[in-house]
């Protein structure tokens, strides 16, 4: 069986995501679509609006055959590391192709770009370190670098999906047998579009409408199972965790904060200075952000603090990856069975005594996530892969 991989977050799953899954199958000719999906904490450092089990269910009912969780150590990361984790798991699963969305309005040869980076990494690094403007954010620096070393590309690092597409291409090119890339142009709504019109809207616009209690506006833009979840489940945001985050920052010593992953350049002092005056998560971010430290960078740091993540813990997961199965259709289950002998990573279907140490960071992340609201179900123990048959 041929498999096409997609790397996703589904925050929440909407009609554009269903189109992506359909296009992945159609353009690649694959029998199976495999989604590597972030768990309860996401790439930009946000808690998911709906828990990972609800989002996996939405995916399985709308064109995805197998949902694998992207471990927290990979999911709450900059684009390059997020891509590194996703590609690693898809390669382990023997996927022949990768389909991803792009915000780019012009045709871009992502595979050629990935090959260029693979062959010119030292030049790229040298150009990056030669930049003199220390106030530029990482995306701004990378845009400047590629305008110098690869001018014909006209890359724009301001678009999140475009950045991810380039990161996928770079990482994919490092493997002996790269996957075939299928970029899909976004249908109607862009990543940052905050308005809803028609049946396709961005996840940003959907979340904004949900938090503004404008659920009727959202319903035409999502499949029925997502609509059901949005109407019956508690919606989660950073404000659910603000008391825990504030307590953690206040009670931690500077030395303890310094031990947190990505706590660099004295950010622990700035956090200590600003935390008492901040009355909400949003206010803390506004007080902390600068041209150099973007909202997203600081939001990821807040997640690392909340989860008490350390560099050693993150690197342990990077070196000891695994495939945690969240759900499958009969096709997805058959594919796992067919490829099991070739898969070099542990395949995990439930949290147990045998794998608790390996999954320790994910378990802790899930426990913290569950603390965000009393209505949230158990996320770790007693949970087995969801099964969905499209014919039922």
From Swiss-Prot:
Binding site for ATP: 7-20, 101, 161, 186
The reaction(s) this protein catalyses: cytidine(34) in elongator tRNA(Met) + acetate + ATP = N(4)-acetylcytidine(34) in elongator tRNA(Met) + AMP + diphosphate
Annotated compartments: Cytoplasm
A Gene Ontology biological process term: tRNA modification
EC number: 6.3.4.-
Superkingdom of origin organism: Bacteria
Keywords tagged on the record: ATP-binding, Cytoplasm, Ligase, Nucleotide-binding, RNA-binding, tRNA processing, tRNA-binding
Enzyme class at the top of the EC tree: ligase
InterPro entries linked: Rossmann-like_a/b/a_fold, tRNA(Met)_cyd_acetate_ligase
Gene Ontology cellular component list: cytoplasm
GO-annotated molecular function: ATP binding; ligase activity, forming carbon-nitrogen bonds; tRNA binding
Function according to Swiss-Prot or TrEMBL: Catalyzes the formation of N(4)-acetylcytidine (ac(4)C) at the wobble position of elongator tRNA(Met), using acetate and ATP as substrates. First activates an acetate ion to form acetyladenylate (Ac-AMP) and then transfers the acetyl group to tRNA to form ac(4)C34.
Similarity annotation: Belongs to the TmcAL family.
Designated name of the protein: tRNA(Met) cytidine acetate ligase
Record lineage: Bacteria, Bacillati, Bacillota, Bacilli, Lactobacillales
Name of the coding gene: tmcAL
